[in-house]
Amino acid sequence: MLRSTISLLMNSAAQKTMTNSNFVLNAPKITLTKVEQNICNLLNDYTDLYNQKYHNKPEPLTLRITGGWVRDKLLGQGSHDLDIAINVMSGEQFATGLNEYLQQHYAKYGAKPHNIHKIDKNPEKSKHLETATTKLFGVEVDFVNLRSEKYTELSRIPKVCFGTPEEDALRRDATLNALFYNIHKGEVEDFTKRGLQDLKDGVLRTPLPAKQTFLDDPLRVLRLIRFASRFNFTIDPEVMAEMGDPQINVAFNSKISRERVGVEMEKILVGPTPLLALQLIQRAHLENVIFFWHNDSSVVKFNEENCQDMDKINHVYNDNILNSHLKSFIELYPMFLEKLPILREKIGRSPGFQQNFILSAILSPMANLQIIGNPKKKINNLVSVTESIVKEGLKLSKNDAAVIAKTVDSICSYEEILAKFADRSQLKKSEIGIFLRNFNGEWETAHFASLSDAFLKIPKLETKKIELLFQNYNEFYSYIFDNNLNNCHELKPIVDGKQMAKLLQMKPGPWLGKINNEAIRWQFDNPTGTDQELITHLKAILPKYL
């Protein structure tokens, strides 16, 4: 659909010949919104004044909108990502002059000057040159000078200096992200000579040779994968082949901060087509570096020498277990979703749920494996390796890490509960309720991850076995809602702790927490029970907790 949209826009839009120093091409015309037109008019007026004042020395001030905005406008999509590249000064210098101009000409534009926020260099966050940010007509606009980059073998942080438009375009991750919009000419500029065609064809290609591009900054691999997933584009076969180069894996580990990996992966996992991205990750054999369990080499080394589960964890990584599991999940996921309209609906409503479910499903080979989270602690220092992958490897939130780890490490116990549920006589309502409370409201993630794990273990041709599996899980899911267990984590004892201690003629102490759990258990099996009936039950079992 997106590709046909591109063709339509690029073929039917008013076209004109655009000339650059080295080549001529036909470029589509971008239609600006009213606000965008106001911004461009202001920038044009200020640029004209500046060039008149300085007589175009050393060269005329020229402004270009860069990157994602140009791509998205050509795709017919709205974009609020407005980055302006400047050729003869820094972003801060330009923004300061523009603000002074606005103060003098407020009546003409009706736009208030805003404070300029300077974003300093921060290479670890991929900010290699300082950027100035301000608001124009209610839109945040970033100003930065055109730049060129030179990399070393040991770092993804380049030496950055002022550059030409060609140099700035060639340093970008993809040709279709290297398109510029010349504000003064109202034209799209394609200094890579391939960006417009690649955008029309839906192809992601690096402006420079792919291997060196990826070795310079391996994050570009993940960015291309994300763009392929977001727009349903293909990656050029030669570029795809270089993604799988073992050298890229090594560079990925040594050059990229886990925070940057996490930012890209979170965008992928909450996006519209995460499966395509996972397929590309699996084909490039990047799963081991993307889903690695820690970013601190000293912690990794300590675990290699002292962790009991390390051989099993390394087996998952080194013997292709994770890659094979990921491949199976990708192949069978469409069939899995087709059978579960409830899951499709839930994923459609909640991108966060989609992220946590997918991570739980693909990390299931790590179930119940632990690492030493803090080598300095002598006791209680074991952490689920799944939790570490999510929290330290992907740098997602503590809550997401806890939910995913609990889900993965409970897959076997969830399957055991389902096996008992198949024979209702073996399972009390309280046993189900107490089990579900362990997930603190996130039991549905565990439910579908457990079903996914069981589903992947059944050969595709054993259709009767598959149907029986889904039937059992669907019946269990319905049972939970029919018996009001879906929010069972919110259930509290009908007698509060203070009153309970008084009625049991006991002083509050450690016993009270255990008795509270027994009260909850009793309430699951006796939903219409009274306070007095509960106290009578608790008196009978109290001695074993003292």
Swiss-Prot record:
GO terms for molecular function: ATP binding; ATP:3'-cytidine-cytidine-tRNA adenylyltransferase activity; CC tRNA cytidylyltransferase activity; CCA tRNA nucleotidyltransferase activity; RNA binding. One of its GO terms (biological process) is tRNA 3'-terminal CCA addition. GO terms for cellular component: mitochondrial matrix; mitochondrion; nucleus. It holds the Pfam family PolyA_pol_RNAbd. It comes from the Eukaryota. InterPro entries: NT_sf, PolA_pol_head_dom, PolyA_RNA-bd. Transmembrane segments: none annotated. Present with 13500 molecules/cell in log phase SD medium. Nucleotidyltransferase that catalyzes the addition and repair of the essential 3'-terminal CCA sequence in tRNAs, which is necessary for the attachment of amino acids to the 3' terminus of tRNA molecules, using CTP and ATP as substrates. tRNA 3'-terminal CCA addition is required both for tRNA processing and repair. Also involved in tRNA surveillance by mediating tandem CCA addition to generate a CCACCA at the 3' terminus of unstable tRNAs. While stable tRNAs receive only 3'-terminal CCA, unstable tRNAs are marked with CCACCA and rapidly degraded. Belongs to the tRNA nucleotidyltransferase/poly(A) polymerase family. This is CCA tRNA nucleotidyltransferase, mitochondrial. The lineage of its organism: Eukaryota, Fungi, Dikarya, Ascomycota, Saccharomycotina.
